[in-house]
Amino acid sequence: MKIGIDISQLTHQGTGVEKYLKNLVTTLLKTDKENDYILFFSSLRRKLDYSFINKLTGSRVEIKIFHFPPLLLDFIWNRIHVFPIEYLIGNVDIFISSDWTQPPTLKAKKATILYDLIVYKYPEETHNKFSFNPIKLLVSPNIVESQKRRLFWVKNEVDLVFCISQATKEDAKKILGIEGQKLKVIYP
């Protein structure tokens, strides 16, 4: 079986999202000796930590690196929800997304990681305005709206949601209305 995993969030070193994703990928690759893995990475400016990746590479692991801006992927996958992930990484049986986007798939089953629902519970604590700095050529997205778009697709299309805590699982049931059998708690 081929399993694809979005590892783009590994660029956010020192965050809980990065630590959880790194532990999940490391554990899967150390314990699973049967399946092949395709790791998808995309970032316009940030670089992948190759010291971590070099420890994971082997005959069963392939890394696909792209340099798409996160706003483009948000538009393509969260807003208009086109361009299946298989067009970039090839055929996979399962695709695990992480924190920023929820791509469609052609045939692959979908799983995702749900860290929290702060965009619903405390939107004022999250960046909730779109801004552009023409001097630095920096675009700062509205994280609240982007996450809500992603979570719409999570609720309606994803087959399995890995929650990082029991509280996140309960929030997913209560706030998003996701059925309990689709939710699995995997602690950090």
Q: Residues of each region from the PLM?
A:
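Carbohydrate transferase catalytic cores enriched for Leloir-type hexosyltransferases
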Residues: 1-188
